[in-house]
A protein has these predicted regions:
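Bacterial N-terminal signal peptides that target proteins for export
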Residues: 1-7
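N-terminal periplasmic/intermembrane-space "pro-region" immediately following the signal or transit peptide
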Residues: 21-114
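Outer membrane beta-barrel
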Residues: 80-250, 267-285, 321-336, 340
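Sec/Tat signal peptide C-region and signal peptidase I cleavage site
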Residues: 16-20
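Detector for outer-membrane/organellar transmembrane beta-barrel domains
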Residues: 280-401
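Outer-membrane beta-barrel "beta-signal"
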Residues: 413, 439-451
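Sequence/structural signature of outer-membrane beta-barrel proteins
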Residues: 106, 155, 168-174, 197-201, ...
Length: 451
């Protein structure tokens, strides 16, 4: 009833108002009201659109950019064997090395340029007249075994490029100076630069602290081009062209004519060809390596460089290791050949005068046998012996190298992972063609910190 009462009243009021105002005024008011309503509707819609939205799903992580030569991702202070699964598509660099001090008491004598290690070929036999002659006994301190290296791993569209640059401080003139060890790069089956010869096996080097090591071991770091065309199930086959070197002994030629003998130098026309076959298993490993080379000579003090010529050298190196009780290991090697002294660790020559003072290749035999024993978690020892023997030619002098013998025994302690210290007894002997010989023996205490 109340609703029916106010509707007629409202109609009468509107009619009165309409009569009091002109049509134009009424139209303007209606337009303004409509505009106000539209503004209110727009504001309501805007408020509704400002409600909290659901959190968007996180975007997937972008794949790391491929490594490039110009912008490597660097990981410094990590060794290859300790590295944690780095990103496969990022280049990285690893710094490694060691700080090492050798404290040596030499009971006898050694060529002063080599007194920081024991090389049988550098033991003075005839005194006076040989380098190292003098009173017995000397203390030697040396940091020359300290080394520094840099490895890099660079992804490319052709595969992973690996490089290795390293040096120690064992200068050949007795100084503490840079001595390059490795300058190497490899991609897949191909390798170039300087590294261990394909003819040698570094895995038979014993657990000793003397720098030079067994005299009868094939050991040389050589510039080379290498290919490993086959590697499967622990077996690998490798070939290399290596830098040639002719180690000459002018022998009795220099006795007859010192000036004439002084003119002879090596003449290397072809690279050395080496090949190796290796097999690794749970029990150890075996390796067979061979070499074929041309060694030559010439006289640079004559007008026509005569006499000159070449001879063929060849050799075989058989090496291996055998795991025995616990963590113990037996390592051994046997090498034989003609004109392979350039590849032996110590002593000998490739070419020397023979009958009628004509050039002949000199035969070498080298061998080593060492036993590496682990006493406890932090204690270990090595004991062994090695020899390099040459079959001297008729034209070599009485003082020519005939045999170098080498042996050592030690006790080593590793208190922490990267620290090693120990005491080693080292013995060596040099025997000449005429049968004269001399020995040297020493005690060496060393401390090494690797990183």
């Amino acid at each position: 009833m109340k609703q029916q009462a106010w509707i007629p009243a409202l109609a009468l009021a509107l009619c009165g108002t309409a009569q009091a105002q002109s049509n134009e005024e009424l139209k303007a008011k209606l337009d303004q009201a409509l505009k106000t309503i539209e503004d209110l509707q727009s504001r309501v819609q805007a408020l509704e659109q400002q409600k909290p939205a659901a959190a968007p799903a996180p975007a997937p992580a972008a794949a790391p950019a491929a490594g490039t030569w110009g912008a490597p991702v660097v990981s410094v202070g990590t060794r290859a064997e300790d590295a944690k699964t780095p990103d496969a598509d990022k280049a990285r660099v690893e710094v490694y090395g060691q700080v090492m001090l050798d404290s040596i008491y030499d009971f006898k004598r050694m060529d002063p340029d080599w007194n920081a290690t024991l090389r049988p070929s550098k033991i003075p036999v005839v005194c006076p007249g040989s380098a190292g002659c003098g009173e017995d006994g000397a203390w030697v301190f040396s940091a020359r075994q300290s080394s520094l290296g840099l490895r890099s791993f660079i992804p490319t569209s052709f595969g992973l490029v690996k490089t290795d640059l390293s040096f120690d401080l064992f200068g050949s003139d007795g100084s503490t100076s840079i001595h390059w060890l490795s300058i190497w790069a490899e991609l897949g089956m191909f390798g170039v630069g300087q590294t261990y010869s394909n003819f040698m096996d570094i895995d038979v080097f014993p657990n000793t602290i003397d720098y030079w090591g067994p005299s009868g071991m094939v050991f040389v770091r050589n510039p080379q081009l290498r290919i490993t065309p086959w590697s499967k199930d622990g077996a690998s086959l490798a070939f290399a062209l290596e830098a040639p070197n002719s180690a000459l002994d002018t022998g009795k030629i220099s006795d007859i004519s010192p000036d004439f003998g002084a003119g002879f130098t090596g003449w290397n026309r072809l690279p050395d060809l080496t090949g190796s076959l290796r097999y690794d298993a749970d029990w150890g490993h075996v390796k067979a390596a061979g070499i074929l080379r041309q060694v030559g000579y010439q006289n640079t003090l004559t007008a026509d460089n005569k006499p000159s010529g070449h001879e063929t050298g060849y050799g075989l190196n058989l090496t291996g290791s055998l795991k025995v009780a616990g963590k113990d290991k037996l390592v051994g090697a046997f090498a034989w050949g003609k004109a392979i002294a350039s590849y032996m660790n110590d002593g000998g020559v490739d070419l020397a005068p023979g009958d009628g003072l004509r050039a002949e290749t000199v035969q070498s035999i080298g061998w080593l046998a060492y036993y590496n024993h682990v006493w406890a978690e932090n204690w270990s020892s090595a004991i062994g012996f090695s020899q390099h023997i040459q079959d001297n030619t008729a034209g070599q002098t009485a003082t020519a190298f005939r045999r170098g013998s080498y042996g050592n025994v030690n006790l080593l302690y590793t208190p922490w992972k990267n620290v090693l210290t120990g005491l080693e007894f080292v013995w060596g002997e040099l025997e000449q063609k005429d049968g004269q010989s001399a020995t040297d023996y020493r005690l060496q205490f060393s401390t090494k910190v690797t990183f």
